[in-house]
Design a protein with these regions (language model features):
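N-terminal metal-binding scaffold of metallo-dependent hydrolase/deaminase domains
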Residues: 1-40, 47-51
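Generic beta-strand/beta-sheet core signal
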Residues: 12, 61, 114, 217-219, ...
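Metal-associated gating/positioning segment near the N- to mid-region
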Residues: 49-115
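Hydrophobic faces of well-ordered beta-strands that scaffold small-molecule active sites
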Residues: 56-58, 111, 146, 214-216, ...
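Metal-coordinating catalytic core of metallo-dependent amide/deamination hydrolases
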Residues: 127-228, 233
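Glycine-enriched alpha-helix->loop->beta-strand junction motifs that scaffold or abut catalytic
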Residues: 230-237, 253-260
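Active-site-adjacent beta->alpha loops and helix N-cap segments on the catalytic face
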Residues: 244-252
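Conserved small/polar residues in nucleotide/adenosyl-binding loops
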Residues: 265-269
Length: 269
């Protein structure tokens, strides 16, 4: 056990900070209060120091780029196919990248690492600690979400390759087509009908069953389309970056979706 004594504690459950103690066991907070004691605990005196909860950065590309960079599009998205749900971004994450050191030194203790936004269906994300050297040991949970993208990023990527989609409506069509086909595949399985195994549709099943959320890169140009499309399948979803969301407040509230703005970690060494 670890006992942190005499810090100015800023707990999430209290209205005001107080001078007190935090007792940890097996890497988790066991008790917060004043005058705590534990005979077998390592004790550290934090008199004059502040003790705050770690910051969670829920949308990050940290460690997906080279040489300490957060990421570049070519590193954090596989662009061979605009529909790439089977891509798992944990295989691209490098915890020796300088971003992780910068994060922990500045109080960011947990990251939601997502694929980039060059595809329409980009892949799955994971949650990780920011300290360690083996990303699989650092990982808190795999497959926390499916990353989707609308707008200029997939449009521009595949337009430059003379591939579909090369328009905003083409991007939305591919998104709709994917979930329609994945739902038909899932429904057949649920009815006990024989289906040929399809990994791309298998990845969509926990999304369609609301077990994990879809997280859609989207700005004001495509926000109404994103809400309409994902609400049609009753998905849990968040709009990522969400520039111009003030234009769609009523639609956002009615859909029950979440909003995530910018990542906390966008630095290069």
């Amino acid at each position: 056990m670890l006992l942190l004594k005499n810090a100015t504690v800023y707990p999430q459950t209290e209205k005001a900070p107080f001078v007190g103690d935090v007792l940890c066991e097996n890497g988790r907070i066991k008790e917060i209060g004043k005058d705590l004691s534990a005979d077998d605990a390592e004790t550290i005196d934090l008199t004059g120091l502040n003790l705050l909860p770690g910051i969670v950065d829920c949308h990050s590309h940290a460690g997906l780029g080279p040489n300490g960079d957060v990421a570049t599009l070519s590193y954090c998205t596989d662009t061979a196919n605009p529909v790439s749900p089977e891509m798992d971004v944990i295989y691209a994450a490098d915890p020796t990248n300088g971003c992780y050191r910068w994060a922990i030194e500045n109080g960011v203790t947990t990251l939601g690492i997502l694929p980039g936004s060059c595809d329409v269906i980009d892949g799955t994300g994971f949650a990780t600690r920011t300290w360690g050297s083996n990303i699989f040991e650092m990982c808190l949970k795999r497959n926390i979400c499916m990353k989707l993208s609308l707008g200029e990023n997939p449009k521009g990527m595949f337009q430059n390759k003379n591939m579909e989609p090369d328009s905003r409506m083409g991007v939305t069509f591919i998104l709709e087509e994917y979930f329609a086909n994945a739902k038909a595949y899932m429904d057949k399985k649920d009815r006990g009908e024989k289906v040929d195994y399809n990994e791309q549709y298998e990845v969509a099943i926990p999304v369609l069953k609301r077990e994990i959320p879809a997280r859609i890169h989207c700005t004001h140009n495509d926000m109404a389309a994103a809400i309409q499309c994902l609400s049609k399948y009753n998905l849990r979803f968040t709009i990522e970056h969400a520039w111009g969301s003030s234009n769609y407040l009523d639609e956002i509230v009615a859909s029950g979706c979440g909003i995530v703005y910018l990542s906390l970690i966008h630095i290069s060494e």
